[in-house]
Regions:
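Membrane-embedded alpha-helical bundles of polytopic integral membrane proteins
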Residues: 2-178, 182-213
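Short helical (or helix-break) motifs at transmembrane helix termini and adjacent helical loops
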Residues: 152-162, 218-230
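Membrane-embedded alpha-helical segments of transport systems
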Residues: 153, 183, 221, 248-256
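Hydrophobic alpha-helical transmembrane segments that constitute the membrane-spanning cores
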Residues: 192, 196, 260-265
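Short amphipathic alpha-helical segments
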Residues: 207-215, 219, 223-227, 246
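C-terminal transmembrane helix pair
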Residues: 229, 254-256, 260, 264
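Interfacial loop-to-transmembrane junctions
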Residues: 231-254
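Juxtamembrane boundary at the C-terminal end of a transmembrane helix
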Residues: 264-275
Length: 275
């Protein structure tokens, strides 16, 4: 078996295992159980972020305590700025800045973006966690569709990029990512969203549009973490997931696209109220 086929098989087995857990939790667990899972996942993501950095243990402990306070104070922060907390808006702002630098500045990301900058990790992962808490209270099928839409984009980009990719999209930022892979991911995602809109009553036209608008940010999450890893001199953020690397390697696109999904949803619903 070729190395490419072996890698794809390993990634597929891991993806199926993760998908089974995610589907079971989203469709059959209570809000409390799902929120506990989201909290544990977010904590693991932040621990992995800190493990890649070269900061002192004292600094890591301080930020770890701060992170736990943030995600455990969801009701407090959510009550300040309903339905999006102030922390979430800061995280979304960071992703908008990242998107601007990727698409309009040829991928020249700010030097402030690094694994050693715990403030960035704190904001982005906290925003992801708080948005997931918010989405759990809505239709579970829509939440599942959002998660799988991003996974479909990643899978389509990976398969097409590996087999047909020739032209780098942003060679200085991530030379292995290709234009062909990007197109493959976008087409796969668009097909998935159309099917979700046609066959799932929980996915309204507005929901479908938010899923489409969020996909460029899935790309941003992917490129952003590629930049961070290149800057830190590491290939993966961990090794817990066979074929994928670390948790951050698996959910890098979700960290960006899920908060932006809620942002666009609120934006479109607000705009719709004026017409």
């Amino acid at each position: 078996m070729s190395e490419l086929k072996q890698e794809f098989l390993q990634r597929s087995i891991t993806a199926i295992f993760i998908s089974a857990i995610v589907i079971t939790l989203i469709l059959y667990s209570s809000n409390l159980i799902l929120n506990i899972f989201i909290s544990i996942l977010s904590l693991a993501l932040f621990l992995e972020w800190m493990s890649v950095s070269k900061s002192s243990n004292g600094k890591r402990l301080i930020f770890l305590i701060l992170f736990i306070i943030l995600i455990s104070s969801n009701h407090y922060f959510g009550g300040l700025f309903e339905p999006i907390s102030f922390i979430t808006m800061l995280g979304i702002t960071v992703w908008i800045v990242v998107a601007y630098q990727i698409f309009f500045k040829q991928g020249r990301l700010s030097s402030n973006f690094a694994f050693n900058n715990f403030w960035i990790g704190l904001l982005l992962i906290s925003a992801f966690c708080l948005v997931c808490f918010q989405l759990v209270t809505g239709p579970r099928i829509f939440l599942l569709a959002v998660i799988f839409n991003i996974a479909v984009f990643d899978t389509g980009a990976y398969i097409i990029g590996k087999n047909l990719g020739k032209n780098s999209f942003l060679p200085k930022l991530s030379p292995n990512k290709t234009i062909e892979g990007l197109i493959g991911g976008l087409m796969s995602s668009l097909f998935f969203v159309i099917c979700a809109y046609l066959f799932l009553e929980e996915v309204s036209l507005v929901n479908a549009l938010t899923m489409i608008l969020a996909i460029p940010f899935a790309l941003c999450g992917d490129y952003f973490f590629s930049f961070l890893k290149r800057k830190a001199g590491v290939k993966d953020t961990g090794s817990i997931l066979p074929g994928h690397g670390g948790l951050l390697d698996r959910v890098d696109s979700h960290l960006a696209a899920i908060p932006m999904t809620l942002f666009f949803s609120l934006l479109l619903h607000t705009a719709g109220s004026y017409f």
